[in-house]
């Protein structure tokens, strides 16, 4: 789907979130990596419109950019946020847990089957 540079960037973000969570936990700061599904950005929608047969159905499953904000808002309000810190989360799955919907009222489907499982890191800390 994407090239190695894209994948390396995503993997680096996941590891950075994990490592930052260790450093910031004593200060009460939570850090997570959030995996979004296909985003219905203006650019993405133009691509879909230019080749509707090629991308049939994909727009129906795309998440709005506002959906990301709604999930982040729910996370910020979660009194148990620190228990999620240092982990990778799929936005659609968090949304289902929090009862968050997209701007059109839909509950986006988790892209886990397409993207694979989220990254997990060990608890070892070297000081």
Regions found by a protein language model. Give the residues of each.
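Residue-level detector of anion-binding/catalytic polar loops
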Residues: 30
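C-terminal helical subdomain
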Residues: 33, 55-127
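Flexible loop/turn segments at secondary-structure boundaries
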Residues: 40-41, 97
